[in-house]
Amino acid sequence: LKCKNKLVPFLSKTCPEGKNLCYKMTLKKVTPKIKRG
């Protein structure tokens, strides 16, 4: 799956593979972490 890191720039900082992960799939995993942090 091709992901657009431009939509979620914070992914690059939170997830090492943010560039390869899909923003839809990553948002679900990263969002809860960002709310706590």
From Swiss-Prot:
Kindly indicate whether the keyword DNA-binding belongs to this entry: no
Q: Which UniProt keywords apply?
A: Blood coagulation cascade inhibiting toxin, Disulfide bond, Hemostasis impairing toxin, Secreted, Toxin
Q: Which GO terms describe its cellular component?
A: extracellular region
Q: Which InterPro entries match?
A: Cytotoxin_Cobra, Snake_toxin-like_sf, Toxin_cobra-type
**UniProt PTM comment:** May contain several disulfide bonds.
Tissue-specificity statement:
Expressed by the venom gland.
Q: Which GO terms describe its molecular function?
A: toxin activity
Q: Which domain of life is it from?
A: Eukaryota
Kindly list the places in or outside the cell where this protein is found, as annotated in its UniProt entry.
Secreted
Per UniProt, what is one Pfam family of this protein?
Toxin_cobra-type
Assembly and partners are described as: Heterotetramer composed of two A and two B chains; non-covalently linked. Does not exist as a complex in the crude venom.
Concerning its family, UniProt says:
Belongs to the three-finger toxin family. Short-chain subfamily. Type IB cytotoxin sub-subfamily.
**Biological role stated in the UniProt entry:** Hemextin A (monomer): exhibits mild anticoagulant activity. It specifically inhibits the activation of FX (F10) by the TF-FVIIa complex (extrinsic tenase complex (ETC)) by non-competitively inhibiting the enzymatic activity of FVIIa.
Provide the protein name: Hemextin A
